[in-house]
Design a protein with these regions (language model features):
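Active-site donor-nucleotide binding/catalytic segment of nucleotide-sugar enzymes
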Residues: 9-12, 115, 172-192, 220-258, ...
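A donor-sugar binding/catalytic signature common to diverse glycosyltransferases
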Residues: 12, 31, 291-339
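Active-site donor-binding acidic/aromatic loop of nucleotide-activated sugar
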Residues: 281-291
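A nucleotide-sugar donor-handling region in carbohydrate enzymes
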Residues: 143-211, 222-237
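Short internal beta-strands
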Residues: 38-46, 260-266
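Active-site and donor-binding regions of nucleotide-sugar-utilizing enzymes
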Residues: 11-33, 40-84, 94-101, 106-165
Length: 420
């Protein structure tokens, strides 16, 4: 019989922070909903996890992680196991009755969440498919976030394994009510649609206190149009020019208008700054350190405009109701444009057609890595954002995403309904 209170989450880190970011967020959301859950996170890159949650010790193969009033077990994917035993003495769990067997580690081989088609570590694969292992296990594959139609079709679709007692099913994040929706954490619940930016005064104040206290970012309170920039390594010329032209255009009617761009730590920071210097530093930039996940969530809600990349920050941006631009992960044959256009199709009905034209034009140009990005649509989109013309479209889209429900809650409801 399934022990539905014990959940193992598997994460093989491919994108430095994207994969573990979603997994950490999912674990937080599950614990927030049900603090009594026993979670075990199996992660292949503890260094990346440490950047996101400083409590993680990258040198420990097995460790406890304290989140609010709960304790998770964190396990290194790369454990070396022979015949069901850890190879080195230092990797044993320190328990009174430890006999070196993996089964004594209390690994919850009941509900297993495989995230992003990550597969399973060798030691877990051997245990699951050992001839003597007959207990029923439900594997739930949490797939990549996409707006493509196949997400609707694959959600809750059963899949086979090589053993009848090992069940598997697809669980699809997405942007429609036919999918599992998005992970909604506390910060999104604080302020969805409560103000033009979708952020309550409480959330805004909490962010200012939390981020400035831990990171020294005291410039947040300055009156300026605040842009957050987080991207993959790219040329950045069109982005810098588009922002500079936007500021110049706004100053035609307001000489005091200014832009501050907050540069996230990462590979995009240096090329952005290089192009910014070539244009004689036309606006202010502030380099921000790598933020803990909770700080990041609050921080972006204080912005006026967002550049985000990958999966996790896309979901955060979409839920805020703020104007944003998404950069998809580059794929062979420019396939990322398929994903970008799929999301564009989901969004466009929430906007007046004329207002959506520059949004669509820049999203497509920005994600077309085979052609030069055009700056003009970005300038127009920023002008519409500063004048609150496109705000309703982004807010209405965010409302719909909230109405679709919380992926973590849908997941727990699905697990509750299992009768294996």
């Amino acid at each position: 019989m399934l022990d539905k209170n014990k959940i193992m989450i598997l994460c093989k880190v491919v994108d430095n922070f994207g994969d573990i970011g979603v997994v950490y967020r999912l674990a937080r959301a599950l614990s927030d909903l049900r603090p009594n859950l026993e979670l075990t996170l199996v992660v292949s890159n503890l260094e990346s996890f440490h950047k996101m949650a400083s409590q993680i010790d990258p040198t420990k193969r097995i460790q406890d992680f304290h989140y609010k009033n709960t304790t998770w077990k964190i396990v290194d994917w790369n454990l070396e196991v022979e015949n069901g035993k850890l190879k080195t003495e230092s990797e044993k769990l320190e328990t009174e009755n430890d006999t070196d067997k993996l089964s004594t580690f209390h690994f919850p081989l009941s509900i297993i969440l495989e995230c992003f088609q990550c597969g399973r570590p060798d030691w877990l694969e051997e245990q699951l498919f050992a001839p003597e292992f007959t207990r029923t296990v439900q594997i739930i594959q949490i797939d990549y976030l996409t707006a493509e139609e196949y997400a609707d079709e694959f959600h809750l679709l059963k899949s086979g394994t090589r053993r009848a007692n090992i069940k598997k099913i697809f669980f699809m994040p997405g942007f429609t009510e036919k999918t599992a929706g998005l992970i909604i954490n506390q910060v999104e619940n604080l302020g969805a649609t409560a103000s033009p930016s979708g952020v309550t005064p409480f959330a805004h104040a909490h962010c200012l206190h939390s981020v400035s206290a831990t990171s020294g970012l005291h410039t947040l309170a300055q009156p300026a149009f605040k842009i957050f920039f987080f991207a993959y390594e790219d040329d950045c010329s069109a982005v810098v020019k588009g922002i500079a032209d936007f500021q110049n255009k706004m100053r035609e009617t307001d000489s005091d208008f200014s832009v501050v761009v907050y540069l996230a730590e990462g590979k995009s920071s240096a090329p952005f700054e290089e192009k910014w210097k070539i244009l004689n530093s036309p606006f202010k930039i502030v380099k921000i350190p790598f933020l803990q996940q909770e700080e990041f969530d609050y921080f972006i809600t204080t912005m006026d405009f967002l550049f985000v990349r990958g999966e996790d920050s896309l979901a955060r941006a979409a839920l805020t109701g703020l104007p944003y631009i998404w950069q998809a992960y580059k794929q062979d044959e420019n396939y990322q444009l398929v994903k970008v256009n799929a999301l564009i199709d989901r969004m466009k009905d929430y906007f007046e057609p004329k207002l959506f034209e520059p949004i669509q034009a820049f999203w497509q140009s920005y994600n077309d890595y085979e052609n030069t990005t055009k700056s003009e649509p970005l300038t127009l989109m920023l002008l519409d954002s500063a004048n609150h013309k496109n705000q309703k479209g982004f807010s209405d889209f965010a409302k719909k995403l909230h109405e679709n429900g919380n992926l973590a809650e849908h997941l727990l409801n699905y697990i509750d309904g299992l009768s294996l």
